[in-house]
């Protein structure tokens, strides 16, 4: 796996699923391929994106700044600086300085990532802030190691919380989660179906599913009534794709 592929993988792992994630993935691909060279426009676009947490925006801004060539005097962005200040905790800043000194001795991506993984997310963000604010310089490869270590820690905690939700025994939370998943699956089906004639069927199924979820929420139904809703939808989608000659079996 190439370095940039690895960076893209780690960074995208902390972005919530949805149309915005696909957009960010495209921007990252363009940046890494050297196609997008207007850093200022890119940062302005990032700043105004909804849903993303300030830290995720800060990390993406840091990655864009590392990758896109820019004039020396280009102003640093406040939204990135604020996100990478370790919550203003002096303890984080002290640790960030220690980490920075260690990173200065590293020359490889993996070496930097290993060193960084033993620090807290706050210290890692502060260390990125040091580099972003030009208070310290490391090679791009080492900076990417720091980015990936930070993303790995964030993704770990997101995964733990996601697993807690998925394995919860609370039937109301499970019921709501199934309805949310069915609704987002229906939305994705509508987007994929496009405007071909054969798409009408898939659109109809998706529309019915969304109406059903709406009705279930309006009248309040038994928590077990949503079981299998998303899987039924996915089966419909796969049947539609088969008729279209598309084979994608890995949705579940």
Curated annotation (Swiss-Prot):
It is a peripheral membrane protein. Residues 1-164 are annotated as: Membrane-binding. InterPro entries: Flu_matrix_M1, Flu_matrix_M1_C, Flu_matrix_M1_N, Flu_matrix_M1_N_sub1, Flu_matrix_M1_N_sub2, INFV_M1. Pfam families: Flu_M1, Flu_M1_C. The keyword Cytoplasm does not apply. A motif (Nuclear localization signal) lies at residues 101-105. It is found in: Virion membrane; Host nucleus. One of its GO terms (biological process) is viral budding from plasma membrane. GO terms for molecular function: RNA binding; structural constituent of virion. Belongs to the influenza viruses Matrix protein M1 family. Homodimer and homomultimer. Interacts with NEP. Binds ribonucleocapsid by both interacting with genomic RNA and NP protein. May interact with HA and NA. Cannot bind NP without genomic RNA. HAMAP family: INFV_M1. This is Matrix protein 1. The lineage of its organism: Viruses, Riboviria, Orthornavirae, Negarnaviricota, Polyploviricotina.
């Amino acid at each position: 796996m190439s370095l940039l592929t690895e960076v893209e993988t780690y960074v995208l792992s902390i972005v919530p699923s949805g149309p915005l994630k696909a957009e960010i993935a495209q921007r990252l691909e363009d940046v890494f391929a050297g196609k997008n060279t207007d850093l200022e426009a890119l940062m302005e676009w990032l700043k105004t994106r909804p849903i993303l947490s300030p830290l995720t925006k800060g990390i993406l801004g840091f990655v864009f700044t590392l990758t896109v060539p820019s004039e020396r005097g280009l102003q640093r962005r406040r939204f990135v600086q604020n996100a990478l200040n370790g919550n203003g905790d002096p303890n984080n800043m002290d640790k960030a300085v220690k980490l920075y000194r260690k990173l200065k001795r590293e020359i490889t991506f993996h070496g930097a990532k290993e060193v960084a993984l033993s620090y807290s997310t706050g210290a890692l963000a502060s260390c990125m802030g040091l580099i972003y604010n030009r208070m310290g310089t490391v090679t791009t490869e080492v900076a990417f190691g720091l980015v990936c270590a930070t993303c790995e820690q964030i993704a770990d905690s997101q995964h733990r919380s996601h697993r807690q939700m998925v394995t919860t025994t609370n039937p109301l939370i499970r019921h709501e989660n199934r309805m949310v998943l069915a609704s987002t699956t229906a939305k994705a089906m509508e987007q994929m179906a496009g405007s071909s004639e054969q798409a009408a069927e898939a659109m109809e199924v998706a529309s019915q599913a969304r109406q059903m979820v709406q009705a279930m929420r309006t009248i309040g139904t038994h928590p077990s009534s949503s079981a299998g809703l998303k899987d039924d939808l996915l089966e419909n989608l796969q049947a539609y794709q088969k008729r279209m000659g598309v084979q994608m079996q890995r949705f579940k």
